[in-house]
C-alpha cells in the first residue's frame, strides 16, 4: 500500500489527546467546535484550501489558480485599480505556482464560486468576513504567519473523515492486495498509535512537526531511516506485523491521516536534506577522503569512498583495511590528511583531533629543505598526487611534519627577527592558497572578475588611506603579523606541488632562486596590473603578495601618492612609513582604476567612509593645480573659517576624490572618444532619448555634471568646473612639445545666445542684457542664437522698474549701440604672449542671470575661479546691469587684462563739459585688475559710486546719459603709448567725486596730463594698502568676509535715502546711528574713516557687488 498510495511517514492532526491543542489557535478553534486542517506551506496554500472546499481535492489547486487568473483578466475594470504596476505583468507572475496571493484573489474567488470567505486570524478574536457578497455558502480559512492559509472544518468533519479513510484502506488491502487486515488491526493498541501519531505531526505556528525536524536532523547524511516495522520490532510491540506503520494508521478508524500534507512535508524534508548536503559540502564522490565511525560512540577512522549508492555507500577504512557501508561520515579535518598508519604514529583522540608526537618539537635537521604541506582544497580538486599521499613511508611524512611544525614554533617564539627564506616562501604559499580558496567554485571568468575587483579596491585603499584611522606599524608589529599569518599554513598548505622527491626538489630550488631575485628587484612603487592576475597559475612564487592581504593592507601612506604606487610586503622586513611624507605626482595622469563617484552630497574621506557634510561649508575644489602638495585632509563641519596656519592641511573639506585628475568631470569640458574637445550637443527634446549623444564620453560628462549641479544647487557649475579646467591647462603646459590648445570660445557657456534680437533684451521685456564672447585676437565672434528657453534668465519685477530711476531706459539706449567696435586694436598687444585661455564670464549671463548663488562666505584662499555671493548675503548686491556694449569684453583673458582701464579711460565729465550741468553720469563698468585685491578694491568702489550716480540722475536727463561708443574709442587713442603696458586708469571713485558737487565741478576737472598722472599713481597706492590688509587678514587666520557678516541687518550707504533695487529689503530700524535717511548725497560724509584715517576705498563692506567681482581676475 505504501507504493500504491505514495504516502510517506507522517501523522495526523486528529484523534483525542492533549497534543493536538498545542497551539493557541488550535485550542481556540476546538472551543468553537472547529478543527484546523494543515495545508502545504507554499505559494499555493490559498488555492489548495479553496480547491479542497469547493472541488473536494487539493490536487486541483493549479486549476483553481488558472481559473482565477482568467477571471481577473476578464473583469479587469474591477480589479486593476487594486494592482500596483502593470496589470498584465501581475497576471503573468500569478501563473507561477509559488507566487503568493492575497485580498484581490480572495475577492475574485468569492465571485467565481459564489462563496463568502471567513478568516480566523488570531486566537480569542472574532473572525473577519473579508467578502460581503451575502452568499449562503462560506469558506472558512485560518490565516497565520502573515502569508499562510489553512482549512477550517467543523470538528465532526475529522471524525467522519477518519472513519471513511479506514474503510477505504480496509477495502483496498482486502480486495486488491488480498490481505487480511482485521487480525492486524486487533493486535494494535489504538490509543498508542493515536498518541504516537499526534506526537509526530503536531504542527506549530512556525514550522512543521518538531519530531519530524529532529528525525530529519538525524538523517542529514542521506541514510535511510528504519521503517515502521523495524521500529515496532525494536520497541517490542509487535514481532510479525506485515504492514507499515502509516498503513496501520490509515486502517485505524479513530485516526485521520492528512495525506496531502504528509506528501508535501516529506518532499520538503527531502529538499532540506539536499540543500543541507550541498551547503555543508557533504556530497561525496568516489575517491574522496572522509572519516567514518563504525560504532555509535566509537572513534572516527580515515577512509576512502569506494562507491556511491542511492543512500548508503561503501567506504574503505584505511586503518582496518576493510570495506564498510557506513552511516556516519564526516569531512576529514585539514591536519589529518598527512596522517598515515605507522609504528611511531600517535593514535588520534576520540574527538578526532591529531596531536604531534614528541619528535615534532625537537627542531628540524635541515631547515633549508623545501617543505611540502597538505592541501586545504576539497579532495577531488587537488592534485592527483594527493590521492596517493597515504602511500608515503612513515619516515618521510613524519619528518616533513616535524620540520614544518618546529619551524613554525620558532617563528612564533622570535617574531621580531627577519623571517628566513623558507618561511617567506611558506607565507607566500599560504597567501596563494588562501586566495585560491576564496575563488573555489568559480568559473575562470568569475575568478578574473573577482580578482580585478579586489585589485581595484586594494589600489584605492592604498591611495586613499587614513593616517589617523590606521597608524603606522612598527617593525616588530609587521613581523609579528607576518608570523601569525603564516601559522595557519601548517594546516592549509597547498598541495599543488608534486610529491616526487628528486626532480621536484631541484625544481623548487630553482624556483626559489628566481623568486629571490624577483624580490631583490621589487620596489615600493611597483604595482601589478590587473591583467597580471589573469596569468597567475599554479606557480606560487610569481605573485607579489602580503601576509596581511586578507585584512586589506592597513598600512598607512600619504594621501597624495603616485597613482601607480603600490606597497609590496612580500619581504616582511621592518617597514616604517612617515605620516608627514607628501608625494606630488610629477606628471598628472589618471590612475589605473578610478574609484566610483558616489552620489552627492556624500563626501568621502581617504578611507572611503562617508563623512557628515558641513552645512554651507562644502567646497568642490582642493588645489589650484597639480603642483600643490596635499597632505592628509581633515573635514571641518563648522561653517566658520578656521585657521590657515597649518600649511600641511587643506583649507577646504575634501571633495569626493583626492585629486582633480580623478574627478569625474575632469577636464572641465566634454571630450569625445578620441580625447578631443567636443562641441556642446543640443538639448534633448525627445522623450525616448533618440537625440541623445551617441558618444558615451559626452553623455557621461553631462550626466555627471547634471548630478553634481542637482546635488549642489547652491554652487554655480563653474565653481567646480573651473579648477578642473585650470588643472587641465596646467597639465598641458607641463609638456613643452605639445601645443597648448587655444579655445576662442568661453570654456563652458559656448552655446549661450551671444547677441540676440534687441527686442529680447530691451526694457519693455525687463530682461538683463546678455553677454557676448570675445576671442583672443580682439574680434567679435559670430552671434549664436541659443535656445529660447534661456533668452530671459531673470525678469525684473515692475516694482524695480519704478525704483531704478531710469536705469533700464539707459540700459536700452546702450543696447541700441553697435557692439562691433567694443574692442580696440590696442588689445592685441596685451593679449600677445600671455594667457590665451579665456576665463569664465561672470555677472549677468544667460545661464546664471544677474543673481548669482553661492554660500554666504568666501574661502580662506581664493583659487582663481569665480566665487559668487549668495542672494541673502549682506555684502551681495544684485542690481548691477552691464550694457551690451561692454558685455563682450568680460570674456577676455581676465588674468592679464584690465578692461576698465580701456573702456573707461576718460570720464564722461571730462569729455562733455556741456553736459556737466545736466548731471550726466557714465555707467559704471566692471573693473578687472591684474591683482586680486586691487581688482576687488576698484570694483567695489566703482559699484558703490555707480549706485550713487544712478540714484541722483533726474528723469529729464535720461536721454543724454551716455556718449557714443565711437567717441569713447577715439578718446582711448589719445592715451600716451608709453602707458599702454601699465593700463592703469583713474578710479571711478574719483570720477564720481568730481560729479558729486556741481558747484565745484569746474575746479575738479583737470588737464589731460594731470588726469594721466592720477591714473598712474592712485591705483598703486591703493594696491599697497590692500596688500597690507591682506597680509594682516592672513596672519589673523580669518577672511575679511568673516568680519563683515551682518546677516541682513546692515544697510549700505548706497541705499540711504531710497529703497533697494533688488533682492531682499534691509531693515532700517536698527540703523539710527547712520544719521537721517533723507540726508542728501551732497552734504558731505563721502567716506567713513577707518582706524588709520584713510577712507574705506578698499573695504568690501562698501562693495555693491560683494564677492562677485572676485571672479574677474585670477
From Swiss-Prot:
Biased composition (Low complexity): 392-404, 474-487
Underlying gene: OTUD4
Ranges for region Variable-loop: 94-104
GO cellular component: cytoplasm; cytosol; nucleus
Catalysis performed (reactions): Thiol-dependent hydrolysis of ester, thioester, amide, peptide and isopeptide bonds formed by the C-terminal Gly of ubiquitin (a 76-residue protein attached to proteins as an intracellular targeting signal)
GO biological process: antiviral innate immune response; DNA alkylation repair; negative regulation of interleukin-1-mediated signaling pathway; negative regulation of toll-like receptor signaling pathway; protein K11-linked deubiquitination; protein K48-linked deubiquitination; protein K63-linked deubiquitination; proteolysis
Domain OTU: start-end pairs: 34-155
Induction profile: By HIV-1 insertion.
Sites bearing Phosphoserine, chain numbering: 126, 128, 166, 199, 202, 204, 341, 443, 546, 893, 900, 1006, 1011, 1014, 1023-1024, 1049
Protein name: OTU domain-containing protein 4
Chain positions covered by the region annotation Cys-loop: 39-45
Bias type Polar residues, positions: 1039-1048
Amino acid at each position: 500500500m505504501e507504493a500504491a498510495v505514495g504516502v510517506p511517514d507522517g501523522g495526523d492532526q486528529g484523534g483525542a489527546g492533549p497534543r493536538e491543542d498545542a497551539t493557541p489557535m488550535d485550542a481556540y478553534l476546538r472551543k468553537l467546535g472547529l478543527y484546523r486542517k494543515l495545508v502545504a506551506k507554499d505559494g499555493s496554500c490559498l488555492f489548495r484550501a479553496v480547491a479542497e472546499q469547493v472541488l473536494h481535492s487539493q490536487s486541483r489547486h493549479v486549476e483553481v489558480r488558472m481559473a482565477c487568473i482568467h477571471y481577473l483578466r476578464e473583469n479587469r475594470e474591477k480589479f486593476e485599480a487594486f494592482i500596483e504596476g502593470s496589470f498584465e505583468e501581475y497576471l503573468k507572475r500569478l501563473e507561477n505556482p509559488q507566487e503568493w496571493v492575497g485580498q484581490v484573489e480572495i475577492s475574485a474567488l468569492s465571485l467565481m464560486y459564489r462563496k463568502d470567505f471567513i478568516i480566523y486570524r488570531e486566537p480569542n478574536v472574532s473572525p473577519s468576513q473579508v467578502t460581503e457578497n451575502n452568499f449562503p455558502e462560506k469558506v472558512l480559512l485560518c490565516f497565520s504567519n502573515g502569508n499562510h492559509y489553512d482549512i477550517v472544518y467543523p470538528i465532526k468533519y475529522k471524525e467522519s473523515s477518519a472513519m471513511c479513510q479506514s474503510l477505504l484502506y480496509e477495502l483496498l488491502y482486502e480486495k486488491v492486495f488480498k490481505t487480511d487486515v482485521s487480525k492486524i488491526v486487533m493486535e494494535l493498541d489504538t490509543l498508542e498509535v493515536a498518541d504516537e501519531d499526534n506526537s509526530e505531526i503536531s504542527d506549530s505556528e512556525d514550522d512543521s512537526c518538531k519530531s519530524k525536524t529532529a528525525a530529519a536532523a538525524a538523517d542529514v547524511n542521506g541514510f535511510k531511516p528504519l521503517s515502521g516495522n523495524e521500529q515496532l520490532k525494536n520497541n517490542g510491540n509487535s514481532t510479525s506485523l506485515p504492514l507499515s506503520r502509516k498503513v496501520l494508521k490509515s486502517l485505524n478508524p479513530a485516526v485521520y491521516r492528512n495525506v496531502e500534507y504528509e506528501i508535501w512535508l516529506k518532499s520538503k524534508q527531502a529538499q532540506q536534506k539536499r540543500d543541507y548536503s550541498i551547503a555543508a559540502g557533504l556530497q561525496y564522490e568516489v575517491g574522496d577522503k572522509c572519516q567514518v565511525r563504525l560504532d555509535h560512540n566509537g572513534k572516527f577512522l580515515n577512509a576512502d569512498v569506494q562507491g556511491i549508492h542511492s543512500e548508503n555507500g561503501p567506504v574503505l577504512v584505511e586503518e582496518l583495511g576493510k570495506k564498510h557501508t557506513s552511516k556516519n561520515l564526516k569531512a576529514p579535518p585539514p591536519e589529518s590528511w598527512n596522517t598515515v598508519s605507522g609504528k611511531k604514529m600517535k593514535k588520534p583522540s576520540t574527538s578526532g583531533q591529531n596531536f604531534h608526537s614528541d619528535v615534532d618539537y625537537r627542531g628540524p635537521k635541515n631547515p633549508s629543505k623545501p617543505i611540502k604541506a597538505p592541501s586545504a582544497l576539497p579532495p577531488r580538486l587537488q592534485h592527483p598526487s594527493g590521492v596517493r599521499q597515504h602511500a608515503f613511508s612513515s619516515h618521510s611524512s613524519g619528518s616533513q611534519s616535524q620540520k614544518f611544525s618546529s619551524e613554525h614554533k620558532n617563528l612564533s617564539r622570535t617574531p621580531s627577527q627577519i623571517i628566513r627564506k623558507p618561511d617567506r616562501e611558506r607565507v607566500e604559499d599560504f597567501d596563494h592558497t588562501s586566495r585560491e580558496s576564496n575563488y573555489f567554485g568559480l568559473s575562470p571568468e568569475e575568478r578574473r572578475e573577482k580578482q580585478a575587483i579586489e585589485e581595484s579596491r586594494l589600489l584605492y585603499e592604498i591611495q586613499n588611506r587614513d593616517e589617523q584611522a590606521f597608524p603606522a606599524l612598527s617593525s616588530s608589529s609587521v613581523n609579528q603579523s607576518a608570523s601569525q599569518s603564516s601559522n595557519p599554513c601548517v594546516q592549509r598548505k597547498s598541495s599543488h606541488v608534486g610529491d616526487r622527491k628528486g626532480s621536484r626538489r631541484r625544481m623548487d630550488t630553482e624556483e626559489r632562486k628566481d623568486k629571490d631575485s624577483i624580490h631583490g628587484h621589487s620596489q615600493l612603487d611597483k604595482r601589478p596590473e590587473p591583467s597580471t592576475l589573469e596569468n597567475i597559475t599554479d606557480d606560487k612564487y610569481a605573485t607579489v603578495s602580503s601576509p596581511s592581504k586578507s585584512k586589506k593592507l592597513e598600512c598607512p601612506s600619504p594621501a597624495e601618492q603616485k597613482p601607480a604606487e603600490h606597497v609590496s610586503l612580500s619581504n616582511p622586513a621592518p617597514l616604517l612609513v612617515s605620516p608627514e611624507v607628501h608625494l606630488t605626482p610629477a606628471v598628472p595622469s589618471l590612475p589605473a582604476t578610478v574609484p566610483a563617484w558616489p552620489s552627492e552630497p556624500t563626501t568621502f574621506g581617504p578611507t572611503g567612509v562617508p563623512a557628515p557634510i558641513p552645512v554651507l561649508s562644502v567646497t568642490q575644489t582642493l588645489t589650484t593645480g597639480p603642483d600643490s602638495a596635499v597632505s592628509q585632509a581633515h573635514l571641518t563641519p563648522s561653517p566658520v573659517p578656521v585657521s590657515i596656519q597649518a600649511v600641511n592641511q587643506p583649507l577646504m573639506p575634501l571633495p569626493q576624490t583626492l585629486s582633480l585628475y580623478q574627478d569625474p568631470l575632469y577636464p572641465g569640458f566634454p571630450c569625445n572618444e578620441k580625447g578631443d574637445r567636443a562641441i556642446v550637443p543640443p538639448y534633448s527634446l525627445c522623450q525616448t532619448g533618440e537625440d541623445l549623444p551617441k558618444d558615451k564620453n559626452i553623455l557621461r560628462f553631462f550626466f555627471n555634471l547634471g548630478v553634481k549641479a542637482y546635488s549642489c544647487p547652491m554652487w554655480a557649475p563653474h565653481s567646480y568646473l573651473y579648477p578642473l579646467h585650470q588643472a587641465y591647462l596646467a597639465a598641458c603646459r607641463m609638456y613643452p612639445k605639445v601645443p597648448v590648445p587655444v579655445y576662442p570660445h568661453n570654456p563652458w557657456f559656448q552655446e549661450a545666445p551671444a547677441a540676440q534680437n534687441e527686442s529680447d533684451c530691451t526694457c519693455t521685456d525687463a530682461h538683463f542684457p546678455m553677454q557676448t564672447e570675445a576671442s583672443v585676437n580682439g574680434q567679435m565672434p559670430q552671434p549664436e542664437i541659443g535656445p529660447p528657453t534661456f533668452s530671459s534668465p531673470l525678469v525684473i519685477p515692475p516694482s524695480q522698474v519704478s525704483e531704478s530711476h531710469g536705469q533700464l531706459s539707459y540700459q536700452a539706449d546702450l543696447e541700441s549701440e553697435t557692439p562691433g567696435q567694443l574692442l580696440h586694436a590696442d588689445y592685441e598687444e596685451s593679449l600677445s604672449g600671455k594667457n590665451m585661455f579665456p576665463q569664465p564670464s561672470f555677472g549677468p549671463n544667460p545661464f546664471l542671470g544677474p543673481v548669482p548663488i553661492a554660500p554666504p562666505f568666501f574661502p580662506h584662499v581664493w583659487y582663481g575661479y569665480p566665487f559668487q555671493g549668495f542672494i541673502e548675503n549682506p555684502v551681495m548686491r544684485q542690481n548691477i546691469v552691464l550694457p551690451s556694449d561692454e558685455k563682450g569684453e568680460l570674456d577676455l583673458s581676465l588674468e592679464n587684462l584690465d578692461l576698465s582701464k580701456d573702456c573707461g579711460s576718460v570720464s564722461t565729465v571730462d569729455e562733455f563739459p556741456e553736459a556737466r550741468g545736466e548731471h550726466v553720469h557714465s555707467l559704471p563698468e566692471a573693473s578687472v585688475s591684474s591683482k586680486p585685491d586691487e581688482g576687488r578694491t576698484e570694483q567695489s568702489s566703482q559699484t558703490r559710486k555707480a549706485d550713487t550716480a544712478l540714484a541722483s540722475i533726474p528723469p529729464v536727463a535720461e536721454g543724454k546719459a551716455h556718449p557714443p561708443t565711437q567717441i569713447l574709442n577715439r578718446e582711448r587713442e589719445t592715451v600716451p603709448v608709453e602707458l599702454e603696458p601699465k593700463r592703469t586708469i583713474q578710479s571711478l571713485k574719483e570720477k564720481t567725486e568730481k560729479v558729486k558737487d556741481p558747484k565745484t565741478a569746474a575746479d575738479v576737472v583737470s588737464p589731460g596730463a594731470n588726469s594721466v598722472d592720477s591714473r598712474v599713481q592712485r591705483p598703486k597706492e591703493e594696491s599697497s594698502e590692500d596688500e597690507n590688509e591682506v597680509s594682516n587678514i592672513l596672519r589673523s587666520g580669518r577672511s575679511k568676509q568673516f568680519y563683515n557678516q551682518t546677516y541682513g541687518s546692515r544697510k549700505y550707504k548706497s541705499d540711504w535715502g531710497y529703497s533697494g533695487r533688488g533682492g531682499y529689503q534691509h531693515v532700517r530700524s536698527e540703523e539710527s546711528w547712520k544719521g537721517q535717511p533723507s540726508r542728501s548725497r551732497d552734504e558731505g560724509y563721502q567716506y567713513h574713516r577707518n582706524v588709520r584715517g584713510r577712507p574705506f576705498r578698499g573695504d568690501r563692506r562698501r562693495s555693491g557687488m560683494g564677492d562677485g567681482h572676485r571672479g574677474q581676475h585670477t
